[in-house]
Amino acid sequence: MTPPEGAKTELAKRVVVALDVRQNDHGDLVVTKGDQYDVREKCEVKGRGGVRNLGKPVALASRYYQEGADEIAFLNITSFRQGVLEDAPMLQVLEEASRSCFVPLTVGGGIRSYTDDESGKTYGALEVAATYFRAGADKVSIGSDAVYAAEDYQKSQGHLSSETSIEQISQVYGVQAVVISIDPKRVYVTSPDEAAAAGHVVVSCDDNVGPNGETFCWYQCTVKGGREERPICAVTVAKACQALGAGEIMLNCINADGQGTGFDLTLMKAVSDAVTIPVIASSGAGKAEHFSQVFTKTNVQAALAAGMFHREEVTIQEVKDHMKDENIPTRI
């Protein structure tokens, strides 16, 4: 239907579903979900619990497409341990999903240059991305490699080398094909001055006060699935990656991950205000209202959830119905 002449039109806000994919202890690919990035069940006795198994990747992706997801993101959360080109099961998942899911598919994990330990052959990030695109991906999500690229960009005072994975992939496939996944965590400070002097963007965090009553924090980026901290903040990484050629930011928050208490609105606002490319809010969604909150209080263009959909606590349709009731443009 054509809108009335002079009526304001807005882009629909997107509801994205994420599927964190990894091998379980039996070697099968399963969809799992972390609690602050820990994907293993809590174990009362000494030792590790098993990997949470929330279903098969292709079956879940097909279900979410039928239920109205605007996009689906496959995140290969252990890909830093091996090369993507040797990960035939993950590529097969992507190929099968692309035959039944006719919405944009994003795949992340291992988008980097690497050398195969057995053959000694080196593969470039562009070649890795091309393999994912041939398997059916519409976008690739770059994580750790993007943080390293942002650090180099900052050190070089804004020099474009044309050698980063972001630049190489966006130059061939377009900026819309490159998503940056940022995994930050809060670092609380008593005063903003010291962190700001180090180049970090410090924000007021009254909604998430620190353990000692701190009301300021900055968001420190991590790599390797949250296992290693880097001396750079999320806002700086987002701005650098936009300059390098990224077309979208998938913004996570380790503190909020798996908590179901809502997105970190302070983080989402800080980053979405700092860049002009779309930002996808991620981590913390537990009910439909959380989507409406992040869309009305920040400038994000999309919001992502995983666990609440996997466990069928909330449906995609319930989220979109709530958004419609709040006059937030969405695809029904």
Tell what function each PLM region has.
Residues 21-23, 78-79, 111-113, 146-148, ...:
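Active-site-proximal loop/turn and secondary-structure-junction residues that shape catalytic pockets
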Residues 18-19, 75, 106-110, 143, ...:
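A cross-family glycoside hydrolase active-site/sugar-binding cleft signature
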Residues 86-171, 325-326:
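Glycine/small-residue-rich loop that forms an oxyanion/phosphate-binding "nest" at active or ligand-binding sites
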Residues 61, 94, 129, 166, ...:
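Generic hydrophobic/aromatic pocket-lining and core-packing "Φ" positions
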Residues 71-72, 132, 140, 145, ...:
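Hydrophobic residues within beta-strands of alpha/beta enzymes
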Residues 2-101, 157-161, 168, 172-180, ...:
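Conserved N-terminal beta1-alpha1 strand-loop-helix module at the mouth
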Residues 101-139, 188-191, 266-303:
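Catalytic cores of alpha/beta
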Residues 25-27, 258-260, 288-292, 311-314:
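Short active-site-adjacent structural elements
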